[in-house]
Each structure stands twice: as structure tokens, then as C-alpha cells.
């Protein structure tokens, strides 16, 4: 996790983290087989305070002017190879400080008011290590333009007015789900409709087989029902005709055209008795005629 660096202490020269060295864990367990001049970690003596597995190197010792013996110096006096590493850290610290002061328009040596510069989450001493390899979700902050400085081409062209540009957000593909295209969804809907139509055709075929068996019964029932309905309609019509005129005692009413309907119906269709009488008369006449014809000859 990145350490929170107070920019006020960094610009005022009070940040001493570039003087910190990590203590050898094998040395703390008395198991380190390397000398202090060979190990890349610190081997501090007993009088040096260790905090969170790190010690602070003596700045005067790096410059070669520390003469504190009684009491002994509470800071670590590093060997030569660790001094070289601390000097590199010091140069990086100074370059970062000068770049920030130049960007903010602060002259070197000018004190910075507390709270003037916000705290920034960064570690200026992890140089040469790509940040994306350890934190792929880390995005560069506002310190990167500050370190790079202004563009000389842009400064010659004059100030640029910022404009608001709407950028379409790119959809990040996910490996745990499959995106459904509109064409595939439409094709799936057509398949569902076709399957529904096939199911309806099969159901109609099944019902037609069962309905064919009941067709004859239905036809007979329909014929009987039609005859009964016709008889009921005729009876209802006759009742309506008869009930249309009320009979008044002592008065005669004029003959209606509908009253002649039963007579016409009766005369148009003679009864079987009439047919029998006519049949007997005709045969009798023919018999009599044949008998007279035979007598003459």
C-alpha cells in the first residue's frame, strides 16, 4: 500500500524517510552468515532504535562528519554500499522536491504554509518499478503533469481554452458472461413462433381424429333438432296469428288474408282419402268401359 506523503513536510525538507533502511531479519535472529559490509540489509547495533523493521541512517555519518561517541549515536551508521544506496535516494528526493516547487511557483528556500499543498498518496523512492505491474487499477494523478512540465509547443501557441467533450464510455467485455446480439434474439423469437405453430397443427390433427367419430351422431342430432325447431316455429306462428285478433261477442270481423292460408294449404295438398276415392272411381270406370266393349264384340 502506498504511503501517504505530506507534501508540506516534503517541501520543507523535513521528510527523512529516504534515510530509512530495512533491517536484516536473519540478523535479528542471529542467523545471518553475511558480514554487515556484504549484506544488502542493515545490521544495526544494540543502541540503534528499530521501528517496524527499519532503521534511520545518520545523515552526518553519510557525510562523514558524525563524532558522537558518548553517548553513542542513536542513528544507524551504514556501511559504504548502503551509503551509496542512500545517496541515490537523496538525489531522487531532491529532484522531486525541486520539480514540485517549480510547478507551484515557489522559490527554493521559501517556506511553505501548512495546508497549502494537499497530501498525496505516492512513494517517490520506488523508482524504476512500473506501477501497473503491482496495481493495475491505479491511475496517474495530478503529479505526472507537474513533473513533466508545460509543453513548449503549447506555450508558444498561447493559452488553450478547455472544452467539454463527451466521450462514449467503452463497454468492457466480460469473460464470465456471453453478450446476446439483437440478431440472435430475433432468430430465437422466430424459432419460438415456428414451434408454437407446429404444436397448434399437431393439436388440430389430434382433435380432428376424435371429432370424425362424433360427426355422424352430431349430424343426426342436428337433423332432429332442425325438424323440432321447424315444428315449434310453425306452432308459434299459428299461435301468433290466432292470438293477433281478439274475439268479440256479437260482432263479425272482416276476413283477413291470413285466414285463407289453412284453406289454400288444405286444397293444395289433398288428404289420402281423396286419393283413394279418385283411384276407385277411375278403376271402376275403366272396368265398366272394358266390359261394355267386350259385349259389343
From Swiss-Prot:
Repeat is among the record's keywords: yes
Gene Ontology biological process: apoptotic process; compound eye photoreceptor cell differentiation; eye development; muscle cell cellular homeostasis; muscle organ development; regulation of alternative mRNA splicing, via spliceosome; regulation of female receptivity; regulation of gene expression
Gene Ontology CC annotations of this record: cytoplasm; H zone; nucleoplasm; nucleus; perinuclear region of cytoplasm; Z disc
Keywords: Developmental protein, Metal-binding, Nucleus, Repeat, Sensory transduction, Vision, Zinc, Zinc-finger
C3H1-type zinc finger segments: 18-46, 52-80
Tissue-specific expression: Expressed in embryonic muscle cells.
Protein localization: Nucleus
GO molecular function: nucleic acid binding; RNA binding; zinc ion binding
Coiled coil (UniProt feature): none
Family: Belongs to the muscleblind family.
PANTHER family: MUSCLEBLIND-LIKE PROTEIN, PROTEIN MUSCLEBLIND
Function summary: Required for terminal differentiation of photoreceptor cells. Vital for embryonic development.
Name used for this protein in its record: Protein muscleblind
Organism encoding this protein: Drosophila melanogaster (Fruit fly)
Lineage: Eukaryota, Metazoa, Ecdysozoa, Arthropoda, Hexapoda
Gene: mbl
Amino acid at each position: 500500500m502506498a504511503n501517504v506523503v505530506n507534501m508540506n513536510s516534503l517541501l520543507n525538507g523535513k521528510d527523512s524517510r529516504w534515510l530509512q533502511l530495512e533491517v536484516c531479519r536473519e540478523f535479528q535472529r542471529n542467523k545471518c552468515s553475511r558480514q554487515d559490509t556484504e549484506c544488502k540489509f542493515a545490521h544495526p547495533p544494540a543502541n540503534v532504535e528499530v521501528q517496524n523493521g527499519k532503521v534511520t541512517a545518520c545523515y552526518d555519518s553519510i557525510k562523514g562528519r558524525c563524532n558522537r561517541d558518548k553517548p553513542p549515536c542513536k542513528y544507524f551508521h551504514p556501511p559504504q554500499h548502503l551509503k551509496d544506496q542512500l545517496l541515490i535516494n537523496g538525489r531522487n528526493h531532491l529532484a522531486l522536491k525541486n520539480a514540485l516547487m517549480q510547478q507551484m511557483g515557489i522559490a527554493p528556500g521559501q517556506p511553505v504554509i501548512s495546508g497549502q499543498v494537499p497530501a498525496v498518496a505516492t512513494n517517490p523512492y520506488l523508482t524504476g518499478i512500473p506501477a501497473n505491474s503491482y496495481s493495475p487499477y491505479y491511475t496517474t494523478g495530478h503529479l505526472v503533469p507537474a513533473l513533466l512540465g508545460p509543453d513548449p509547443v503549447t506555450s508558444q501557441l498561447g493559452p488553450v481554452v478547455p472544452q467539454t467533450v463527451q466521450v462514449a464510455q467503452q463497454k468492457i467485455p466480460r469473460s464470465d458472461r456471453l453478450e446476446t446480439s439483437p440478431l440472435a434474439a430475433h432468430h430465437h423469437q422466430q424459432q419460438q413462433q415456428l414451434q408454437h405453430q407446429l404444436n397448434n397443427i399437431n393439436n388440430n390433427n389430434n382433435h380432428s381424429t376424435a371429432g370424425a367419430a362424433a360427426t355422424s351422431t352430431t349430424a343426426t342430432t342436428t337433423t332432429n333438432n332442425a325438424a323440432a325447431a321447424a315444428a315449434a316455429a310453425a306452432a308459434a306462428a299459428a299461435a301468433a296469428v290466432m292470438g293477433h285478433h281478439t274475439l268479440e261477442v256479437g260482432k263479425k270481423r272482416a276476413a283477413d288474408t291470413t285466414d285463407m292460408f289453412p284453406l289454400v294449404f288444405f286444397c293444395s295438398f289433398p288428404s289420402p282419402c281423396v286419393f283413394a276415392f279418385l283411384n276407385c272411381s277411375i278403376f271402376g270406370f275403366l272396368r265398366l268401359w272394358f266390359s261394355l266393349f267386350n259385349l259389343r264384340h
